[in-house]
Amino acid sequence: MSVMFDPDTAIYPFPPKPTPLSIDEKAYYREKIKRLLKERNAVMVAHYYTDPEIQQLAEETGGCISDSLEMARFGAKHPASTLLVAGVRFMGETAKILSPEKTILMPTLQAECSLDLGCPVEEFNAFCDAHPDHTVVVYANTSAAVKARADWVVTSSIAVELIDHLDSLGEKIIWAPDKHLGRYVQKQTGADILCWQGACIVHDEFKTQALTRLQEEYLDAAILVHPESPQAIVDMADAVGSTSQLIAAAKTLPHQWLIVATDRGIFYKMQQAVPDKELLEAPTAGEGATCRSCAHCPWMAMNGLQAIAEALEQEGSNHEVHVDERLRERALVPLNRMLDFAATLRG
């Protein structure tokens, strides 16, 4: 597997942690959000990594809790005129690309993703220009501008299948931005992949030594790992997959104890799926190591109840997602290819 671009390790400034709300304040904002959703003909589309109270509210109001692929499907098909996307910025952009006629609101437009930040479009365009004979495949965790340069967009839930398909056609591939997922896919498929060197600040922090210690403490536990994790963590897994695939694995595996190496936001839906099983966070610190994200995306945490209420009430430049029309049309092509390919897999 070739690697051409190795940016300096970036230390992204984390946003301040949201101020905790009192029980009364939470109740107030929950009721306000429910009322505003009805008034605005809006629906919530929330990612698995948002806080449990946000996922619960999405459930209660007829919204969607899912991975980024299903978020894209749900938002495009739902009849609501407004989508409230609880996630990070690229998810709001993707919703606007697929549903330009709808108003796309986010609790904050400052909710970033380290994979998106780690793949600036100018550098990525130069990288692609240097390898014009490669098919460009980018992860969903990228900006609209990077998607517009791509031949395909992909999510982790269909990454192996898509790359296997392209490899069967004899295509050489540029993969961006996640190096760990890229290496995992290359190992699974044997494809010729030229890999960008980005990483998720959450998954990159899982620690092998500390996980080994935890495994020794819970000998009968299964280890579930998202493929954005380092190879050494993936090698320890009993199941590897996207968020939705890990929830499915939790139901299928016979183990009573499950050690989960992904953002702890997934525990809300995973525990619903396996109420009789015990879920443990894979360690991001220990054995002398420390963590910054500590198994929860700091930008996902920005999707609080107060911010959601303000987005629905205020709209405006602080909350509404806009994508340049020419850019949107270009980014729509690889996104539609992804959705069409995913539909063939669903059969």
From Swiss-Prot:
One of its GO terms (cellular component) is cytosol. GO terms for biological process: 'de novo' NAD biosynthetic process from L-aspartate. Belongs to the quinolinate synthase family. Type 1 subfamily. Its EC number is 2.5.1.72. It comes from the Bacteria. It comes from Shigella dysenteriae serotype 1 (strain Sd197). It is an enzyme of class 2 (transferase). GO terms for molecular function: 4 iron, 4 sulfur cluster binding; metal ion binding; quinolinate synthetase A activity. This is Quinolinate synthase. Pfam families: NadA. It is found in: Cytoplasm. Pathway: Cofactor biosynthesis; NAD(+) biosynthesis; quinolinate from iminoaspartate: step 1/1. PANTHER family: QUINOLINATE SYNTHASE, CHLOROPLASTIC (PTHR30573:SF0), QUINOLINATE SYNTHETASE A (PTHR30573). Iminosuccinate binds at residues 47, 68, 139-141, 156, 226-228, 243.
